[in-house]
Amino acid sequence: MQYHPWRWLAAALLALNIASALAANAPRVRVTTSMGQFVIELNPERAPLTVANFLRYVREGHYTDTLFHRVVGNFVIQGGGHAASDMRLKPAHDAIFNESGNGLQNKRGAVGLARSDAPHSGNAQFYVNIADNPDLDPVATRWGYAVFGRVVEGMDVVDRIGAVATGTVGPFKSDAPIKPIVIQKIEEIDAAAAAAPAPSAPAPASSGAGPALPPLPAAPSSPAH
């Protein structure tokens, strides 16, 4: 997907306009998966463009019945791009500007925008860090991976997904959960609703099969589509 700077400028203006309204009450979304639920608190103040982009996909229902197609133990889980029905990559909007310089770090529980080696190539796929991953943060000589939120409830579900058995499945050459992990839906919730505990998922089957985490670019330490 090509990065168009002029489109980013227009999108950035819109994102900045809504950021101030959202920042006071950080928006939250509930991710319902075949292994349980977890809640993400978004940070529109630090990552206005990326949050607006993510919420666009949420509101369009893009994530319904998609996969956590890549799981890397002690690293990340990644998903939101491939349909659960046929494992094909779903159409997505244009890529957005990389907001990795926003000061948010890829620490355990942080949620970021997956991309390819090209710095401004992220669109729909996201990942959750299941460990501290400073190698994904930007440095003076290269772009990082943009964090735009954090898991505030249900990290145990994320950990269970991160522990499933993986291998070669369909089009995925490695790191794909042997037993597909489906994102059944992602929905916006208010702060009051978020305070209610999410239902726990049943314990994983004794087979150990489970979800997968996000695909990374050439570097083994980075999330990509």
Regions found by a protein language model. Name each.
Residues 2-6, 13, 18-225:
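Cyclophilin-like peptidyl-prolyl cis-trans isomerases
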